[in-house]
Design a protein with these regions (language model features):
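Conserved nucleotidyltransferase catalytic core and NTase-mimicking acidic/glycine-rich helix/loop elements
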Residues: 1-7, 13
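A polyanion-binding, active-site-adjacent surface
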Residues: 10, 17-18, 22-274
Length: 274
C-alpha cells in the first residue's frame, strides 16, 4: 500500500488530476507517437537538456587510517632494543624514542608507568584510554581511580605500595584492537619492564594482559583468583595473580566481590613473603 500511495503522490506532483476521462479514447485509432512528435514545435535547447540525475550511491565515506602491515621483524627489533636496556630509565627512554609502532603516530603521549619502581607489587593492565593518553600516565581515569581504591583497601598506594603500567604504551586510535605486530612490540618492552622491576608479586589486570604476559589462551574468568607464576630470564619465579580489570568491574559491579577475594589473596601473599 505504501508503494501505491507514493505513486499517487507522484501523479499529483506531475499535475495529474483525473484517473479516467469523461469520454472514452480509442488508443488504437490515435496517431502513432512519431507523428505527434513531428507535429509538435521544436523544443528549446534548455528543454532538451537532460535533467540532473539523482544520486543513487552514497557519498564516499571519509578515508580511514590504513591498518599497519604485520611485520615480525619489527617485533624482533623491539626485543633487541629492550634487551640492551639495563635500567628502567634506559627502558623508558628507549620506548619513548621507539618509532616502529604505528600506535605511537596517533597517540598524544607515551604512557610508560606510574608509582615507585621498587614497590613490592607490579600491576600490568591493558591499554591507555583517553585520559591516560591525555595525561601520559596509566590508570588515571575512572577505572584508575577504582584501582587506587582497591589497592588502598589492602594498604597499597602508588607512593610505594604498587607500581603500575600497561602492556601497550600508546592508545590505539578509536580504541581499536591492536595488531599482533603492535602487541608483540609492546610485549617485548613489557617483558623487559617486569625483568627490571623484579616485583615480589605481579598482578595482571584484565584478560588482554593475562593472555599476553602469560602466553595463554585461557580466559580471565577461568584464571582470575588463581596463583600462577611468571618466570624471569634468570630463572626467578614471581607469584602472579590474574584479576579483573577495574573497567570491567565498573560495567559488572557484581564481580567486585571476586576481585575483593583476589586482593585478600595478594595481601596474604605479601605477608608470607615478608
Amino acid at each position: 500500500m505504501e508503494g501505491v500511495a507514493a505513486l499517487l503522490r507522484w501523479y499529483v506532483e506531475q499535475g495529474v488530476d483525473e484517473t479516467i476521462g469523461e469520454q472514452p479514447i480509442d488508443r488504437f485509432a490515435a496517431p502513432p507517437p512519431s507523428a505527434i512528435a513531428a507535429a509538435a514545435p521544436a523544443a528549446s535547447p534548455a528543454a532538451l537538456r537532460a535533467p540532473t540525475p539523482l544520486r543513487t550511491t552514497p557519498p564516499p565515506s571519509p578515508s580511514r587510517a590504513p591498518v599497519p602491515i604485520e611485520s615480525p621483524q619489527l617485533v624482533e627489533d623491539a626485543r633487541a632494543l629492550a634487551a640492551r636496556c639495563s635500567t628502567l630509565a634506559e627502558l623508558e627512554t628507549a620506548i619513548r624514542g621507539f618509532e616502529g609502532c604505528a600506535l605511537k603516530r596517533t597517540a598524544k603521549n607515551t604512557v610508560f608507568a606510574d608509582g615507585k619502581p621498587d614497590a613490592p607489587v607490579m600491576v600490568v593492565g591493558e591499554a591507555p584510554g583517553a585520559d591516560e593518553d591525555r595525561l601520559g600516565k596509566p590508570f588515571v581515569g575512572v577505572s584508575g581511580q577504582l584501582m587506587d581504591r582497591m589497592m588502598s583497601a589492602i594498604g597499597l598506594t602508588r607512593d610505594g605500595g604498587f607500581y603500575i603500567t600497561n602492556i601497550l604504551f600508546w592508545r590505539p586510535p578509536g580504541n581499536r584492537t591492536p595488531t599482533s605486530t603492535e602487541q608483540g612490540m609492546c610485549l617485548a618492552f613489557t617483558q623487559r619492564h617486569i625483568e627490571l622491576a623484579r616485583p615480589n608479586v605481579l598482578v595482571l589486570a584484565g584478560g588482554v594482559a593475562v593472555k599476553a604476559v602469560l602466553d595463554t589462551t585461557e580466559g580471565i574468568t577461568r584464571l582470575r583468583g588463581k596463583w600462577t607464576s611468571y618466570r624471569l630470564g634468570d630463572g626467578t619465579v614471581i607469584p602472579t595473580m590474574p584479576t579483573f580489570h577495574p573497567a570491567y568491574l565498573l560495567r559488572t559491579p557484581a564481580s567486585k566481590r571476586q576481585s575483593w577475594q583476589d586482593l585478600l589473596a595478594i595481601d596474604k601473599k605479601l605477608t608470607e613473603l615478608g
